[in-house]
């Protein structure tokens, strides 16, 4: 370089890869809020011009089949963990003398407890679940021995045996027995996987709080500074802004959707078939997943990011992708408008019915008549025409979670550049788009609504977004 400043050379030139099933939303400015009369009189959506950055957004709501992939990964990870713990109890010495000589629980031992010959030397496609989704060592309690153990990672090269008749040995049966509901809880005597065990851990950094408080002296309730035993002032450190599920009273989010919402949301109504079949039956595989809380949706986003980054890691690619996340309220409205200015609906027209009398979305058009539009409940995620950005069902079908906390005055106090009001103490989260059980007012792109973050509904789903990195004009 002849002593000249040339900068660090990257191994590969970066290019933004469009995630499968997403559309590129180019970003730009638009008039956010109600352009028509606010017939409800909420006065919480005044018009203003804002700008959002480009991003990728799922073309459809996340479907049952897509969400099942997340559920199955968590299920497999927990199962491998239980099998590994039982293998350690059976053979506490940490090695398997009969490796390769038979099919028994010993082959599911933690990779760190196997000899180099036994352990899978390749990087697993996915790391493990909960505290097991890191390759670093950590301490935990073996549920079978109630003793502290040191764990690094699971061996994902071994295929789990689900056929009860093919379980290889008694320890394997004992481990699997803990994963299924008891006989007393089994309807018709059929024991199924205990969905209460399906929990996922993910760690986030509260960047906004860190930017404002990092290094600031902590104070008590009276405003007096706090000191340690040596008389030094206690300041906020990085660990204070790490949101770690499973610690500090924060539970691991449950993963399995709440299927009882189909019964609980509607009193004196027969919806048992939806409760029994909607998430389970293959007929509904391409329908939007519902019964998912805001926390569960965020957990899915974290897992989806992890899945892609683990794939790149397996390819020995040092690059990581921007994280998947829920859209902000402004991003959602900008995407729903499809580039159309002052539009009332995503398709641009002033009505939810076409000039030929065809309904343009799945909603409740007439009092008491849910099916006049052709669907009583939800429809497949790729139903009706997409808007000009290629997004389906941005109005109707299911309402969608956003990352934004609900505040009546957020439009007045928020920034005009990538506006978003986040408040982790505010459990009311914005939902947008209206659903199959809503009237046309909630389908309008400027209508705001909210639901509590820990509440699951039969009419709320979600879709994810990913930031676009670089100049979109290149």
Spans of features found by a protein language model:
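Sec-dependent signal peptide cleavage junction
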Residues: 1-21, 87-128, 132, 137-140, ...
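Functional-site microenvironments in short loops/helix caps that host divalent-cation chemistry
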Residues: 2, 24-25, 29-31, 36, ...
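Short proline/glycine-enriched turn/loop segments at secondary-structure junctions
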Residues: 419-423, 449-456
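Short, structured beta-strand segments at or near domain termini in extracellular proteins/domains
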Residues: 458-474
């Amino acid at each position: 370089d002849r002593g000249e400043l040339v900068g660090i050379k990257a191994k590969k030139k970066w290019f933004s890869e469009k995630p499968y099933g997403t559309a590129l939303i180019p970003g730009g400015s638009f008039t956010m809020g109600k352009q028509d009369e606010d017939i409800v009189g909420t006065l919480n959506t005044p018009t203003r011009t804002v700008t959002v950055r480009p991003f990728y957004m799922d073309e459809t709501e996340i479907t049952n089949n897509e969400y099942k992939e997340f559920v199955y990964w968590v299920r497999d990870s927990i199962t491998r963990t239980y099998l590994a713990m039982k293998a350690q109890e059976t053979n506490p010495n940490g090695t398997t003398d009969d490796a390769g000589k038979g099919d028994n629980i010993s082959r599911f031992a933690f990779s760190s407890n196997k000899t180099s010959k036994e352990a899978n030397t390749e990087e697993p496609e996915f790391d493990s679940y909960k505290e097991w989704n890191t390759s670093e060592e950590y301490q935990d309690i073996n549920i079978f021995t109630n003793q502290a153990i040191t764990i690094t990672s699971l061996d994902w090269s071994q295929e789990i045996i689900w056929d009860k008749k093919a379980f290889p040995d008694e320890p394997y049966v004992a481990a699997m027995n803990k994963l299924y509901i008891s006989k007393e809880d089994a309807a018709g005597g059929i024991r199924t996987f205990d969905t209460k065990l399906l929990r996922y851990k993910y760690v986030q950094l509260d960047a906004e709080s860190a930017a404002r408080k990092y290094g600031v002296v902590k104070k008590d309730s009276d405003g007096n500074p706090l000191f340690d035993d040596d008389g030094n002032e206690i300041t906020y450190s990085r660990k204070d802004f790490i949101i770690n599920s499973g610690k500090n009273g924060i539970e691991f989010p449950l993963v399995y959707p709440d299927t009882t919402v189909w019964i609980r949301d509607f009193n004196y109504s027969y919806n048992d078939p939806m409760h029994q079949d909607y998430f389970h039956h293959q007929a509904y595989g391409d329908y939007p997943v519902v019964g998912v809380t805001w926390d569960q949706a965020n957990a899915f986003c974290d897992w989806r990011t992890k899945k892609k980054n683990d794939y790149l890691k397996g390819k020995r690619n040092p690059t990581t992708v921007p994280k998947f996340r829920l859209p902000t309220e402004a991003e959602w409205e900008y995407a729903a408008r499809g580039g159309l200015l002052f539009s009332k609906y995503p398709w641009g027209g002033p009505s939810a019915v076409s000039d030929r009398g065809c309904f343009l979305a799945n909603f409740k058009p007439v009092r008491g008549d849910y099916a006049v539009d052709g669907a009583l409940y939800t429809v497949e995620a790729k139903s009706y025409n997409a808007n000009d950005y290629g997004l389906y069902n941005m109005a109707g079908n299911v309402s969608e979670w956003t990352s934004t906390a609900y505040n009546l005055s957020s439009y007045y106090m928020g920034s005009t550049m990538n506006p978003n009001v986040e408040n982790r103490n505010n459990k009311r989260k914005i939902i947008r788009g209206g659903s199959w059980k809503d009237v046309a007012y909630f389908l309008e792109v400027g209508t705001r609504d909210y639901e509590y973050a820990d509440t699951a509904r039969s009419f709320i789903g979600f879709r994810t977004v990913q930031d676009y990195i670089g100049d979109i004009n290149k």
